[in-house]
Amino acid sequence: MATVQEKAAALNLSALHSPAHRPPGFSVAQKPFGATYVWSSIINTLQTQVEVKKRRHRLKRHNDCFVGSEAVDVIFSHLIQNKYFGDVDIPRAKVVRVCQALMDYKVFEAVPTKVFGKDKKPTFEDSSCSLYRFTTIPNQDSQSGRVNKLYSPARYADALFKSSDIKSASLEDLWENLSLKPANSPHVNISATLSPQVINEVWQEETIGRLLQLVDLPLLDSLLKQQEAVPKVPQPKRQSTIVNSSNYLDRGILKAYSDSQEDEWLSAAIDCLEYLPDQMVVEISRSFPEQPDRTDLVKELLFDAIGRYYSSREPLLNHLSDVHNGIAELLVNGKTEIALEATQLLLKLLDFQNREEFRRLLYFMAVAANPSEFKLQKESDNRMIVKRIFSKAIVDNKNLSKGKTDLLVLFLMDHQKDVFKIPGTLHKIVSVKLMAIQNGRDPNRDAGYIYCQRIEQRDYSNNTEKTTKDELLNLLKTIDEDSKLSAKEKKKLLGQFYKCHPDIFIEHFGD
C-alpha cells in the first residue's frame, strides 16, 4: 500500500498551484487525500499574498514579518473564494484554528519565539500587533555563508508528513477535527486569477454596499464620490525618499535610540515620526536631552512634537463625514458590534498610506493613554489629554457634536487592535461576487442572499403564525410569573389576554 508521502507526491502539488495546470472541472473532492491539497494550497496562498516586510515587535525591529490578522484575512478569503466547502459559512474562529495548525507544524513561527519558552505551546493571535515569520530550513551550504531558503508549499507538505512525531494521517485528522469537510459536489472549481484592478473595484464597491446596510445615511453623495474614486495601488515606502535626503541620519539616530530602549511608549512614538516632515525630525533629534536615561524628558519632547504636527494637519478620517454620524449614533444606542464593523469598513476605504499612518497614530494614542504609562500632565488623566490633543487629527466634522466626537475617538482608541481587521461578512460578499465574475454570471444577481432569502408565501405565513404564537405565549408566561404584580393587577391582565387570545390562554393554562 502506498504511503501518505507517496500519495502526496503523486498529487504533484507544486504544479497544481498554477491555474494553467488545472484541468477543466477540477474538483478537490475528485482527488484522493483532498485535504492534503487544500493544506498545500493554503500555504501557497499565505506565502504569496500576505504582506511580508520589516516590522516592529516587542520594541525591536524584525525583518520579513507579517501580522496575524492579515494572515487570517488572506486565508479566509482564499477558503471562501475557492469554495472548498461548498456554500457553508466559515466562521473567522475556524480560520484562526487553521493558522494555529500551520504554526504548530512550523509553517511559520511567532516573533520572537523565545518569549513562549521551551515547553509552552505558542498561541496564534488574530491581531494586528502579533507578528509572525515564515520558517526557514538549513541549506546544505549554509555553513559557507549562503542564505537559508523558505520551504515551497510542496516541500512543506513533504516535511509535515515526514516529521517523526506526527502520525501519517495527522493532517487529514486535523482537517476533519476542524469540522470543515471538503464538499462532495463535483461543481467545486478552483477559481481563476482575476486582475488586481477588478479585485480592487469589487472590494471598493462591496465595502460601500455593506456600509450602507449598517449605517443610515441621509445623503449618498459622499459615498457615491468615494465609489467613483479609483482604488489606489500602495505607493513605495516613504523611507526610500528619506534615504536620499540629508536628514536620514537624524531619523536613523532616533530609530537606533528606540531600538536600544525596551519601552513600548518610545517605540510607538518613534514609529509615528516617519510621517513627520524632515525639519521637525531634525528639531527633535537636536533637542534630545544630554542624559540618555532621562526617558521622561524624551517622552515629553516626542509627545509635544507629534501632537503639534497632527493638530495642524488635515484629519486622517476627513472622508465620508456622514458615516461618522452614523457610527456615533450606533455607539450612542449601544450597538457596539455593528459600530465596530462599520468602522472596519470605513477604514477599509482609506488608501494604503493613510491607513498605515492612522494605524500607527492610533496605536501610539492607545499606549500614551494608558494610566500606568508616562504622566503627560500632573493634574489630568492621560486618556483625556490624548483625546483632547488628537481628536481633530482624526475627525473634524462640523455636523458631529463634541460629545459624539469624543465618543467616537475613545471608541477607536479602545478598539485599536480590531478596527483594522476586515469583517468576515465582507469577505463572503466579495468572494461570492468574484466567483460569479469568474464563472461568467451576473455578479449582482446572487449577492442578495447574504442579507435576505426569498421564501414561498406559504412558508412566510407559517413562520409569521408560529412566531406570533410563540411571542404571545412568552408574554402570557411573563405575566403569570411576574412576582411584582399584585393579585388584582395580574387577574386584570390575564382577563384582558383571555379576551383577545382565548386559544393561547387555554393552551397554556388548560380548560
UniProtKB/Swiss-Prot annotation:
Domain of life per record: Eukaryota
Disulfide bridge positions per record: none
GO annotation (BP), single: intracellular signal transduction
Xref: InterPro entries: DEP_dom, WH-like_DNA-bd_sf, WH_DNA-bd_sf
DEP domain residues: 46-136
SMART domains for the chain: DEP (SM00049)
The family this protein is said to belong to: Belongs to the DEPDC7 family.
The protein, known as: DEP domain-containing protein 7
Record organism: Pongo abelii (Sumatran orangutan)
Taxonomy of the source species: Eukaryota, Metazoa, Chordata, Craniata, Vertebrata
